[in-house]
Structures are given as C-alpha cells and as structure tokens.
Amino acid sequence: MSTYTRPVMLLLSGLLLLTLAIAVLNTLVPLWLAQEHMSTWQVGVVSSSYFTGNLVGTLLTGYVIKRIGFNRSYYLASFIFAAGCAGLGLMIGFWSWLAWRFVAGVGCAMIWVVVESALMCSGTSRNRGRLLAAYMMVYYVGTFLGQLLVSKVSTELMSVLPWVTGLTLAGILPLLFTRVLNQQAENHDSTSITAMLKLRQARLGVNGCIISGIVLGSLYGLMPLYLNHKGVSNASIGFWMAVLVSAGILGQWPIGRLADKFGRLLVLRVQVFVVILGSIAMLSQAAMAPALFILGAAGFTLYPVAMAWACEKVEHHQLVAMNQALLLSYTVGSLLGPSFTAMLMQNFSDNLLFIMIASVSFIYLLMLLRNAGHTPKPVAHV
C-alpha cells in the first residue's frame, strides 16, 4: 500500500493553503498593531491570546473528532480560522484583536490536531516517519511562501484580509473530494494526555517541546517587531522571516538523518547549543543573515527531534495521546514565551528577545547534559 495515498495527498494540499494564510497573518499582525501605536506589551499579549486559543483548540479537538469525524472537524477548524481572519477587519483595537486572535488560535490548533491525527491513523509503524516528514515539510514550505508573499504584495490590512480569508476557505476544497477514516480510534480511548505528560522516560522530549514553543513563539510573535524597531521595512521583514523559515526547511532532512544515525540525545544537545550561538550572533549584529540561518536551522528542527525522543518511549497504541501531549506542551511554551519576553522588551531592551531565547535554551542544555541514560530501541518509528 502506498504511503502517500489519495486522502493523504489531498489533506496535505489543503494544509499548504492554510499554512500560507497562517504564516502571512502571524507576520503582519504584530506590525499592524505597531502601526496603531500599541505598546510592545500589548503586542505580546495579543500574540499570547493567539497561543491561548491554540491551547483551547488542542484540548477540544479530540472530542470534536470523536463526535463528527476527521473531514467535518477539518471543515469546522477552517471556518473558525477564517472567521478569526475576517474579524480583524471589523474593528481595529486592542480588545477586539485580542478576541479575534484567540478565535484564530483555536481554529489553527484544531487544524494541526486534525491533520496530525489523520496522518497518524492513516499510517503504520513502517511509514509514519515519512508521513510526519511530509507534514513538517508542507508546514514549513507554506510558512516560507507566506513570508515571501509578505515581501511582494501590499501589507495594508484591508488589502491582505480578503485574499487571506479566501486562501483559508480554499484549503477546504481538497478534502471535499475524499474521506479520511479514523481506523484506529478504538486503540486510543484508554490513554490520557495527563498520563503521557507524567511519563518519566519521556520527560526530556516533553521539556524539549515546551522549550521549542518558547523559542518559536517568541520568534514568530516578536521577531517582526524587533526588526521593525531596528528600522527595517515591512517588505524586508518578510524577507528576513523567509530566511529564518527557509533554514528550518533545509534543516529538516539532514538533522532527521543525523538523529537516526547518532542518536537523538546527541543531536538535541548540538541543536540547543547552536540556538544559543545564533542568539549571541544576533545580539552582536555583525552578520544577521548567517545568524538568522543557523537560528532557524536549529530552532525550527528542535520540535520534531524532541517529539521523536518522546514518541519512541511509548507503545504503538499510545502514539496519538503522546502526540497530543507534546502539542499541548509546545502550545504552553508558545503561550508563555511571547508574553513574558514582550514585557522584558518593553521594560528594558529589544535585545532581551535573544537573551531570553539563549537563557531557556541553556537551561534545556543543562537538562540534556545530565545522565539521561542510554536511548532504548524505539518502540515505534514516528
């Protein structure tokens, strides 16, 4: 049986369009807030509202899938995100956008959980790795193309919202021509997310997802603002964000191969060390292009390696629950990162963005350098 079946290909096609829309908004919303003369802490709180929506969406989606299935859950998630996009144009203000970004966050998280769970249930232990790799590549390619769009088109609010909302709705179309079946739902009923979070042998993976959420949440939410405060134009900000994301795309395959060959613990240690080096290089402002590139290559690949570390510690029937627990951990990090970092930037200096990233990475590096024991043979290849 082919790994990339018709439902999988159509699902990933729809995801590409949705990711494109999500990437454009994640870059431009902080800039639109800054243009409305909102303070740095308000920008950070709006970013955290989005990630709070991610948290709520992650918790709700399992129940939604069980009730209405993958296809209709996907449609619902897309409509919720489209509403969050269109709502930004109804009223411009801190409280209004706080609410609409929360709605968008719920829809976004539901999309991720539906797609990831559908891929997990469509695959087997022999091909889940390839499905997950395809998913990550589509996600980052969509994000990269979104950043390029920002650098090429008008970034005015009312110019962007119509076509971004249209892209979101267009992402529904591919799944109208197929049906994704939940063939393994019965195997996962008895496994709770809480049990996965408490699993001692998977703790380094869970902690890695939290740290990854802090790092990427801060970069996505506050890097455009950091560049804006440095006098960089909106078009150039889109270019630099594209550099950051393209590094993450290029790093996926080689880092995954290195993790398989030399072990995930060693690769995680090197990745976190490189994130620290990239943050220090950004603080020096000597060479932003290579600094952003190594920061993206290491930071954007941290999540899948940490996720693989945790997933190899559980049985086959626990994989979906562990995946949900890791996404929840990542979301918590994404929620805490922008809010706390924005307050530091507001009260002290914009450079606190990279000091914060380097600090949390150093803490995780200390965890990894402790005696973690030998990595056992993976239970499942994910």
Curated annotation (Swiss-Prot):
Stored PROSITE patterns: MFS
Record-linked SUPFAM superfamilies: MFS general substrate transporter
Phylogenetic classification of the source organism: Bacteria, Pseudomonadati, Pseudomonadota, Gammaproteobacteria, Enterobacterales
Any one Gene Ontology molecular-function term assigned to this protein's record: transmembrane transporter activity
Subcellular location: Cell inner membrane
Protein name: Uncharacterized MFS-type transporter YcaD
Membrane topology of this protein: Multi-pass membrane protein
This protein's encoding gene: ycaD
Pfam family, one: MFS_1
